[in-house]
Amino acid sequence: MVSIVNIFMDYWFAEIITIGNEVLSGKTVNTNASHIGRRLTSLGFTVRRITAVMDEVDEIASAFREAIDRKPRVIVSSGGLGPTWDDKTAEGLAKALGVNLELNKTAFDMILEKYMTRKIPITEERKKMAYMPYGAIPVENNEGIAPGIYVYHNNIDILATPGVPREMENVLENFINKMLRNRSNLKYLEDFIYVENVMESSLAPYVKELVKKYDIYIKTHPKSYEMSHPILEIQIAGSGKQEEEIKVKIEKVKFELLDAIKKLNGIIRNSL
Amino acid sequence: MVSIVNIFMDYWFAEIITIGNEVLSGKTVNTNASHIGRRLTSLGFTVRRITAVMDEVDEIASAFREAIDRKPRVIVSSGGLGPTWDDKTAEGLAKALGVNLELNKTAFDMILEKYMTRKIPITEERKKMAYMPYGAIPVENNEGIAPGIYVYHNNIDILATPGVPREMENVLENFINKMLRNRSNLKYLEDFIYVENVMESSLAPYVKELVKKYDIYIKTHPKSYEMSHPILEIQIAGSGKQEEEIKVKIEKVKFELLDAIKKLNGIIRNSL
């Protein structure tokens, strides 16, 4: 059986870490991880793991350390950069890297300027956001106060972004535009087929054959009741150096799938 | 500084594993993890980690193995139990436990009955859903075909549920009602305050003091722009053996927080 690893070339793999108890208790749905996942995928990376941990220094440190040990090309975290007692990402990351946490002068200037222009005094809590691991580079946050933290370590681009979605997205884009060193030259393309009246288990043997034949990624997502009223979303995804080549491969796979669906009396839909 | 661990007594901690490339690429938001997190939290568990991994046997096995090594009381996974080539959770779990994957007769009977009553023939793909780690107990799935997988290992209740949300929720409830051995006697309570016109960084020193004073969990979630128009959601959460005791503590904390908010010219809102 063809492994996905072959297709996606795991040299360009990425990991995501989200920090915050609210995700673990289910209070907050982890949309930050989805956004980061989509963005990294669009750049040709394959996200191989997402880890959500509590606001505790040791948990954060171990999540970063374990991710670093798996040698991805990029690690992006979100959460834990704010001014409160439970914002501990900078400390956790420093511990994972084995360096000191120290006042980053550039970060402090960024923060100071934002408060000063609004005539708001700087406090210990506000100053806290300028503490970063030794050697880190602050990343501009145009949507809020806390700068992102960028570190290049063991050939891995490591970025910590704030947890507020708008700020996370902004810091992530600034990092991609100005700092990201490991750039995949892979293109990623995907296409979908929506089908009614075909059970996932009926289509399964065809999908298995096509995955083998084309060395491509096909996944069926059941969207309704398997037996009484089956609706399937079929995802066909590939990545490679030549966009045209992937396009052609996906088209061929779609053609064969549509043929199989016809045999199984499936009804093609335009959307879900 | 008071650690959350003290408050939540991590003897009752839990982990969640979700299996599926669609979560990693950001195609699907991980609402399954949120549901499982909320449900386990309501039972008095503290979810300490959520790990999302690819549909690969080795990745699934390592996620389970690492979770088992951290000695939680419960591990709940979702995804990867279906009939297709990329459904590999049973195999990954067997590998993590160091046991064989084998045809589970009870599971096979469950599956057979569902197809037979609808006069649908059994195929290799459909039979696949009956393969489970040696010693596993199938968990009834009243919303679909694939049964859940329950294993009691190293004093840990391990449950694998399907990835379709409706099926996951049903299998989870069947497991809680019939199989869950490690039952927390802790009650968990939480309350919220919504406030306008107070910056998170202004409230931070008060929150820090109250966390110390009451040994309770307080978290501020900024919902708008920190400086131009700050809106905060303040979460106050506690758990313990006596429901009344936690209630009183949360009320006292709320009282002191409202006092601090008044000092900071905050405006209390009824909701976000």
Swiss-Prot record, chains A, B:
Disulfide bonds: none
InterPro entries: CinA, CinA_Arc, MoaB/Mog-like_dom_sf, MoaB/Mog_dom
SMART domains linked: MoCF_biosynth
Short name of one Pfam family: MoCF_biosynth
HAMAP family named in the record: CinA_A
Family to which this protein belongs: Belongs to the CinA family.
NCBIfam families: PRK01215.1
Protein name as annotated: Protein SSO0103
Lineage: Archaea, Thermoproteota, Thermoprotei, Sulfolobales, Sulfolobaceae
